[in-house]
């Protein structure tokens, strides 16, 4: 794979993972606003399932060398912090 094509694939992989991260955040925002309380087992199940799925996608992209492990970790850490902030705002 040429360097130019590799760069395009890496950028696209990161964009897709960031889009998935945004979708998870929106899902949790909607769930918190309309459906459940943060202490609800359903909320925890959805959150755990979505975060696990994203972590597997990131791991796959890292193994394919489409993104660096540090980029994947930063993406997960950022989403976890955003979701923690949402949770804190709902429980206050």
From Swiss-Prot:
This is UPF0358 protein Exig_1994. InterPro entries: UPF0358, UPF0358_sf. Belongs to the UPF0358 family. Gene3D superfamilies: SO2669-like. SUPFAM superfamilies: EF2458-like. It holds the Pfam family DUF1507.
